[in-house]
Curated annotation (Swiss-Prot):
Its main location: membrane. The gene is nuoB. Transmembrane segments: none annotated. It is an enzyme of class 7 (translocase). Keywords: 4Fe-4S, Cell inner membrane, Cell membrane, Iron, Iron-sulfur, Membrane, Metal-binding, NAD, Quinone, Translocase, Transport, Ubiquinone. InterPro entries: NADH_UbQ_OxRdtase-like_20kDa (IPR006137), NADH_UQ_OxRdtase_20Kd_su (IPR006138). Binds 1 [4Fe-4S] cluster. NDH-1 is composed of 14 different subunits. Subunits NuoB, C, D, E, F, and G constitute the peripheral sector of the complex. This is NADH-quinone oxidoreductase subunit B.
Length: 174
């Protein structure tokens, strides 16, 4: 009986594919749309921002991934934190993050944004932007190359596709 069910399912699948039907879940379509139309907002703080600009230029062209840089946090769904985050800049980072609409994602770019980097032991440096905002993807390097940033963005796209469509992120920060 079990084999009969699978045979009928396979016959139905073949019949539908021959006629040109597409079967999917709404959550999969929403995840695909969100992953392929990211609108990043730059939060460039140091030298990593130069590599981020290079990734957006013609040689690497982040536009082919559906990414359109937005100047306003209210129009963007991805924040790229690139560079050294100081104690004085941390409240501004949190304020900009709070202004972004749901669902929102954060990519931490470079050693300084990930954990303080070269300035880790300085009194004025936050030891990782994940102490201020929840981070989805970390891109290592000092500074990371444009290829590393694009790889991190592709990993974020995979993560977005894995999440369900109607459930928003409920992460809490201190």
């Amino acid at each position: 009986m079990k084999n009969n069910f699978y045979q009928e399912d396979e016959l139905l699948s073949n019949e539908l594919s021959n006629r040109g039907f597409l079967l999917t879940k709404v959550d999969n379509v929403i995840g695909w749309a969100r992953a392929n139309s990211l609108w990043p907002m730059t939060f460039g703080l140091a030298c990593c921002a130069v590599e981020m600009m290079q990734a957006a230029a013609s040689r690497y062209d982040m536009d082919r991934f559906g990414m359109l840089f937005r100047p306003s946090p209210r129009q963007s769904d991805l924040m790229i934190v690139a560079g050294t985050l100081t104690n004085k800049m941390a409240p501004a980072l949190r304020k900009v993050y709070d202004q972004m609409a749901e669902p929102k994602w954060v990519l931490s770019m470079g050693s300084c944004a990930n954990g303080g980097g070269y300035y880790h032991f300085s009194y004025s440096v936050v030891r990782g932007c994940d102490r201020i905002v929840p981070v989805d993807v970390y891109v290592p390097g000092c500074p990371p190359t444009a290829e590393a940033l694009i790889y991190g963005l592709m990993q974020l796209q995979k993560k977005i596709k894995r999440t369900t469509g109607f459930k928003y992120d409920t992460r809490q920060t201190h």
